[in-house]
């Protein structure tokens, strides 16, 4: 009882005292989309589709998203909105008398830390290639030449470290500017740009050799390739796509008016 009372008072004292919240629903959607759309969708999802029956895996993924992931997503938003506090103490607010929820909150914070450990490295690589793109380095460059540039980047020490720190610095700058002028403002223009880039990638991929066969494989489900692991992969991909269990959606929910 004393522990639960202390936890409850701590939660109440640490509710988001700020007045800053997302300005409107569009800002919330863009910020949450920025959290959800990532390497798991661009790199991992096509590989999973190719390994598990094409459209058959997409059907499993859609079912997992609609019937499992979306309800959990809504629950995380509601939890954050109701508690108005961090991911850790949002979990603790469920049952202040049971410490397991506090540990679940700490786990929800630890998971993004692990993800950030490699996302930030890849983010540094991306920034280096972005600078090369703007400087015209890739103009008329062959695939082998681009691969050599990447090998040179990863083979050195200081340049990846510098790009890594630059990427982390940019992230910190955005977060330090707050929800409305930082995360929301950045998401409002970066997510549409990301959408345009994805459309360009799709259009370009359709011009590559074997595109017709790939499209046929994509729209014709092959359920014979579905295994028990396929269900687990589809569920995991669905969770990853919506940033579930990582504290991000709970935290964003705390800033929803």
Task: Please state what every model-predicted region is.
Residues 30-36, 62-67, 107-118, 166-173, ...:
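Hydrophobic alpha-helical transmembrane segments of multi-pass membrane proteins
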Residues 54-62, 99-117, 184-194:
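Alpha-helical transmembrane segments and their helix-start/interface "positive-inside/aromatic belt" motifs
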Residues 39, 69-73, 81, 113-124, ...:
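Transmembrane alpha-helical segments of multi-pass membrane transport proteins and ion-pumping complexes
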Residues 64-73, 107-129, 193-203:
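Hydrophobic alpha-helical membrane-insertion segments
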Residues 7-43, 72-77, 81-103, 257:
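Membrane-interface "cap" regions at the ends of multi-pass membrane proteins
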Residues 24-64, 247-253:
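Transmembrane helix-boundary motif of multi-pass solute transporters/channels
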Residues 17-26, 184, 188-257:
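Membrane-embedded translocation segments of transport machinery
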Residues 17-20, 48-52, 82-107, 120-180, ...:
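Inter-helical loop and helix-membrane interface segments of multi-pass membrane transporters/permeases
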